[in-house]
Amino acid sequence: MSDKVCVFAGQGAQAPGMGKDFAADPEVAALFDRANGVLGFDLAKICFEGPAEDLTKSNICQPAIFTMSVAAFRAFQKKFPAVSFNMAAGLSLGEWTALHIAGVLGFDETLRVLEARGRFMQEACSAQPSGMISVMGATGEQLDAICAKASIYKANINSDAQVVLSGSKEGISIAEGVCKEMGIKAIVLQVAGAFHSPLMMPAREKLVAVLKDVAFAAPKLPVLANTTGALHSNDPQAIKDVMLRQVTESVRWADCIKAAIQGGGKTFIEFGPGKVLSGLIKRIDKSVTTVNVSDVASLDAIVL
């Protein structure tokens, strides 16, 4: 059995120029052309050239990171055709990439879902000023106290040492003050709103109608679910339900990685722009190997 786990980047990793060198391969170029056709705008141009402001819009950013991550994965497969994976995971929108790679839904369908998901999340952010704050080194009890005092929520449990909280702008401001009083390091993030919290319920409700018409299949590769930190079931409807919950519930990334390691994962290969996940994974367990495929140079540097 393979000891390799493929992991896929989430929102925030985007940067102009991403995927451009992969697109020198005609097969990857065709992937971007297909995305352009499905979405009805020039996604490739925005990925390759920017502007960065366009790339930060959730309805563009989410399908862009997905397409670039799939391109990186296909380029890897072409170079290492004999390499197999024992499971897949992705951070937030990256979980959709993992489900596509596992055969749960097609490329075109995933693009359409992510464009809508991004648009709905952006609309929810515009309707209510909200934000996120990254908290480092707090205990579970301290995090509970911060959330209670500020009326905010745990959004991303990235490692035992780093948790991102989501809530109203006022709540985030209160949390920042509480952290200062407690002597806990905290950084307010430059994001559009309170992702992975109940404040995203309007987006989740709109996504229900979109997913109703999308056919899901049982995964051909085990995929870890952000909301549970455990593997998705083989029931397509159950996967759909979990992915709807993901919009408003905590991302239990640390639990996902611990489950992957318990399941035999020793080498984590990150696909997509940047190497944020590799850093998070190393914080969870220093003994594992992390590799990232973000451009042709990083792919060429891999020795397996």
Where do the protein language model's features map onto the residues?
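Alpha/beta catalytic cores of group-transfer enzymes, especially the acyltransferase/condensing modules
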Residues: 11-13, 41, 102-241, 245-246
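Short, charged, surface-exposed secondary-structure boundary motifs
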Residues: 299-304
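Glycine-rich phosphate/pyrophosphate-binding beta-alpha loops
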Residues: 61-63, 194-195, 250
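A short, well-structured juxtamembrane/interface segment
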Residues: 251-259
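FabD-like malonyl-/acyl-CoA
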Residues: 2-142, 189, 267-297
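Non-catalytic positions within long, well-ordered alpha-helices that form the structural scaffold/packing
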Residues: 261-264
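Charged catalytic carboxylate motif
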Residues: 27, 68, 171, 206, ...
